[in-house]
């Protein structure tokens, strides 16, 4: 599912004002950053139970599989690179990083923040992860570049990839028992298409709308074959985020449908929204007047769990993963017990079907010590970035260095930018809820007049806290794009 707003991130950035760039013709400035220690959220309560969400940060469009005793989870990464993240778990609660499927997007203006183009809220999204005949497959769409498939012998990579032809998007994939491969895809009109064995594209003439629009099956499909029945899970948004399930004895239908989860927000309310921003609109200039909409207490919107998939544990029990929108943190992943009633996989427990417990018993006790998927602290002494880091759009690799130009430091060279959202080589982490604290050690001694370096949150509106070099020296600048207010404070020499 494509996001209307991009996720909030914690960032380190460096930019030069356009005015300074125009005056100097060249801006090859340096900034040095180094992080300090911090902590991260874990869903494991340490007593045999867990509390949702699994990750208190953005991880949207989750899709899950099990291979033996190992679980694998794939999620959307949009415009951030490296992209298409895969996590691994033994108990569905404690997760660790496995790999990214690719390092960067192909060269283009939008993915490079070049010539006034950008890819916020675009990029790669809604992955489908599958395991078949000893290989892992990840199917996902890149805006403007169509459907891609990434293939590896291991979830740790390396991954090879090629484009899959055809008008196929927001899909799930089924490797059927008879050797045929099916894609369930599109929004509204749920469509089934048979894929060629080499995954080069669709079998000609095979596409069929199996559930017409208006039958409460929306998007973000997940397809399974269970005990001879075909099941399709979808996210629907009328009147608010919920999960639907369709089933049939044939992949081609006819299908009957059932609501399997609705109105489950774990007590959270819908957050504030911006009414005059979204996909397809220009990025807001500083001074833009944002239309901030107060949430409607009667409509939870997407603050309820909606899109996700299901998986069977080795002990025969079933579990579901889904996402819910949690204010500026983004879309968080939740784990639910699945209760089968009359052949339908309901999220939740018996006598309370469709409503998932926020705290529940872990699927197993294979992991004794609670752990978070990422180590979020970095002293930049390694040869590569820790996997928690992603670039905002493609980086310019000539304008940064890690532990090379200065040992134990990340060095960012400034490039012209109108404001934070256009700053290239911005290094990001997803913001952690419910509250985040970030510390950074920054050497600003080599900033030139017009340069700015620091931290910020990437969203619309954005906010930043940075050190600015003027002809009078260094200043601390705090800017809130929502209110268009800024505070300047001179720094002591």
Report residues per predicted region:
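Bacterial Sec-dependent N-terminal signal peptides
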Residues: 1-25
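Carbohydrate-active catalytic/glycan-binding domains of CAZyme proteins
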Residues: 23-493
């Amino acid at each position: 599912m494509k996001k209307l707003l991009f996720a909030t991130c914690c960032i380190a950035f460096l930019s030069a004002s356009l005015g300074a760039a125009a005056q100097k013709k060249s801006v090859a400035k340096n900034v040095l950053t180094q992080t300090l220690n911090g902590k991260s959220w874990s869903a494991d309560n340490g007593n045999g139970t867990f509390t949702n969400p699994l990750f208190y940060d953005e991880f949207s469009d989750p899709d899950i599989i099990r291979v033996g005793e190992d679980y694998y989870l794939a999620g959307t990464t949009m415009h951030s690179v490296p992209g298409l993240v895969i996590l691994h778990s033994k108990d569905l609660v404690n997760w660790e990083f496995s790999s990214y499927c690719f390092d960067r997007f192909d060269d283009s203006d939008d993915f490079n923040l070049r010539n006034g183009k950008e890819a916020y809220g675009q990029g790669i999204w809604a992955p489908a992860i599958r395991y078949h005949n000893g290989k892992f497959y990840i199917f996902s769409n890149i805006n403007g570049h169509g459907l891609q498939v990434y293939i590896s012998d291991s979830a740790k990579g390396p991954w090879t990839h090629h484009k899959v032809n055809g008008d196929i998007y927001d899909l799930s994939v089924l490797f059927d028992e008879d050797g045929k491969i099916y894609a369930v895809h599109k929004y509204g009109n749920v469509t089934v298409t048979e894929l060629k064995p080499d995954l080069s594209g669709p079998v000609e003439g095979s596409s069929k709308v199996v559930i017409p629009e208006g039958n409460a099956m929306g998007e973000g499909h997940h397809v399974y074959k269970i005990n001879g029945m075909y099941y399709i899970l979808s996210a629907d948004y009328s009147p608010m985020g919920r999960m639907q399930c369709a089933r049939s004895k044939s992949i081609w239908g006819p299908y009957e449908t059932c609501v399997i989860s609705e109105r489950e927000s774990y007590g959270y309310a819908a957050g504030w929204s911006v009414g005059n921003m979204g996909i397809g609109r220009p990025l807001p200039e500083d001074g833009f007047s944002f239309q901030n909409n107060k949430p409607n207490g009667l409509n939870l919107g997407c603050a309820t769990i909606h899109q996700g998939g299901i998986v069977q544990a080795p002990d025969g029990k079933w579990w579901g993963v889904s996402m819910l929108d949690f204010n500026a943190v983004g879309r968080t992943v939740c784990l639910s017990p699945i209760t089968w009633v009359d052949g339908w996989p309901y999220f939740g427990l018996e006598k309370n079907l469709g409503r998932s417990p926020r705290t529940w018993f872990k699927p197993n006790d294979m992991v004794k010590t609670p752990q978070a998927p990422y180590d979020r602290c970095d002293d930049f002494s390694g040869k590569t970035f820790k996997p928690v880091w992603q670039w905002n759009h493609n980086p310019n690799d000539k304008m940064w260095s890690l532990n090379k130009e200065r040992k134990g430091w990340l060095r960012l060279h400034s490039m012209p930018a109108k404001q934070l959202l256009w700053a290239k080589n911005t290094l990001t982490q997803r913001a952690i809820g419910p509250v985040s604290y970030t510390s950074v050690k920054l050497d600003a001694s080599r900033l030139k007049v017009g340069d700015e370096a620091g931290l910020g949150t990437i969203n619309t509106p954005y906010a930043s806290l940075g050190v600015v070099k003027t002809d009078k020296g260094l200043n601390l600048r705090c800017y809130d794009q929502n209110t268009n207010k800024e505070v300047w404070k001179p720094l002591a020499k």
